[in-house]
Amino acid sequence: MPKIPQMKYTVYLFDFDYTLADSSRGIVTCFRSVLERHGYTGITDDMIKRTIGKTLEESFSILTGITDADQLESFRQEYSKEADIYMNANTILFPDTLPTLTHLKKQGIRIGIISTKYRFRILSFLRNHMPDDWFDIIIGGED
């Protein structure tokens, strides 16, 4: 059998939600607040969780059937206000996140985050969990 060459990566890029951290509780809380405020009460937590990773506008469109860009932008703005209150308090790192990232950093590997979650929110959460210069790059939804 031919030998498969081992690849030595020098950079690892991670998504944030459901890869490094679980923010599903905060996401569900924020969506539920906005949706219920507008009369959308039949949407389950599972339905909301299945939209994680999409933009907020895409998620609201999937959950409500609304396609009007102005209305979706309004929902996004409301969600952002809710997230200022609930997101970080309801986000946790997965148990293997810090050991894995520490192992990579000790090997001199550069690490980064690319996510639809806004960069400022990722940075706000990370400030409480790891050194400021831990990630070499963070690209968020506003980028």
Locate the predicted segments by residue.
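Substrate-recognition "cap/lid" segment bordering the active-site pocket of phosphatases
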Residues: 118-143
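N-terminal helical cap/lid subdomain that shapes the substrate entry/recognition surface
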Residues: 7-99, 103, 107, 120
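Residues at the starts of beta-strands that form the adenosine-phosphate
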Residues: 110
